[in-house]
């Protein structure tokens, strides 16, 4: 299905980038499209499985990671997109 949902924190951070830094916002949007196209573990942003939970991460830039989960229906839940994991 590949629908996107956000946690409250993930949505607040996504809106932050949309209003404060268009370059980072565009990178996040590119990563989201890539996740939809290639799945959790392939594509840009050096995707990796997180050890602490069932999620995944991709590099937005040196300081920020896109953290997400994919459920059994292939829906993508954005957990965070600001900071490095739980910073």
Where are these predicted regions, by residue range?
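A short, surface-exposed loop/turn module that caps and links secondary-structure elements
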Residues: 33-59
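Enriched for short, Lys/Arg-rich terminal
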Residues: 1-4, 9-17, 22-26, 59-65, ...
């Amino acid at each position: 299905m590949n629908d996107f949902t956000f946690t409250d924190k993930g949505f607040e951070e996504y809106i932050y980038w949309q209003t404060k830094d268009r370059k980072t916002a565009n990178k996040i949007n590119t990563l989201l499209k890539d996740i939809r196209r290639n799945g959790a573990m392939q594509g840009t942003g050096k995707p990796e499985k997180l050890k602490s939970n069932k999620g995944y991460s991709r590099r937005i830039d040196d300081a920020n990671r896109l953290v997400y989960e994919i459920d059994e229906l292939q829906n993508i839940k954005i957990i965070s997109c600001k900071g490095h994991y739980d910073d």
